[in-house]
């Protein structure tokens, strides 16, 4: 049976993650407060951010930048700004 969480990003109940996907206290916070739907949104933004900014995940500064963007996106309600990207009009 899947567990439900009140998602901090989407501000609604949703299916929780199956296991902790990120290490440490931040990982526990994500596991306890972020839904699968919001995590999937973050993964999409994360991929775009890594590609557009040409981030190297071996570089500690780049990892820290990505972690900061992740916290801002998931918990602060801020969207990821990617220079030069124009979202498709709906």
Swiss-Prot record:
InterPro entries: Fe_traffick_prot_YggX, Fe_traffick_prot_YggX_sf. The keyword Iron applies. Disulfide bonds: none annotated. The keyword Iron applies. It comes from the Bacteria. GO terms for cellular component: cytosol. Keywords: Iron. One of its GO terms (biological process) is cellular response to oxidative stress. GO terms for molecular function: iron ion binding. Coiled coil: none annotated. Could be a mediator in iron transactions between iron acquisition and iron-requiring processes, such as synthesis and/or repair of Fe-S clusters in biosynthetic enzymes. Belongs to the Fe(2+)-trafficking protein family. This is Probable Fe(2+)-trafficking protein. It comes from Vibrio parahaemolyticus serotype O3:K6 (strain RIMD 2210633).
């Amino acid at each position: 049976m899947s567990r439900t969480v009140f998602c901090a990003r989407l501000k609604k109940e949703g299916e929780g993650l199956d296991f902790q996907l990120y290490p440490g206290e931040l990982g526990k916070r994500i596991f306890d407060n972020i839904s699968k739907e919001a995590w999937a949104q973050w993964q999409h933004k994360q991929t775009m951010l890594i590609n557009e900014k040409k981030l190297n995940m071996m570089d500690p500064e780049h990892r820290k930048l990505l972690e900061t963007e992740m916290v801002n996106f998931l918990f602060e309600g801020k969207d990821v700004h990617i220079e030069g990207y124009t979202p498709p009009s709906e």
